[in-house]
Amino acid sequence: NGKPFCYGVFYHHGWAAGRSEGAALNAVSSIPKWLHGTDVVVVGHAHAKTGTKLAAFEPDWTCGQFRKRRIAAGITGSYMLWGSYGRERGYAPKEEGATVVKLSGKRKEAKIVL
């Protein structure tokens, strides 16, 4: 429609408890419950290098209804190879490197690229 738009992006060191990828995804998926207006949420800490799509309902004050906001959520990979810490504590090796967020310039759409 030619109208400008902007993205709400939240990057954080993160937190997660547990050894599974699911534990890390649970941590990142809880953020839109208390931080409204985000289109992209990316955290670290778990070093899981994964992503998912989330959704949240938010009030649209222009029409007095709720609308669904689509949220791209990701976790960054590690920047250390599987070394002493992970090996000594029995963690499985993780994927290294950044989680990339691709923002569309034509429509309001964000994707996590692994």
Where are these regions (language model features)?
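Extended recognition/assembly regions associated with phosphoester-bond processing machinery
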Residues: 1-114
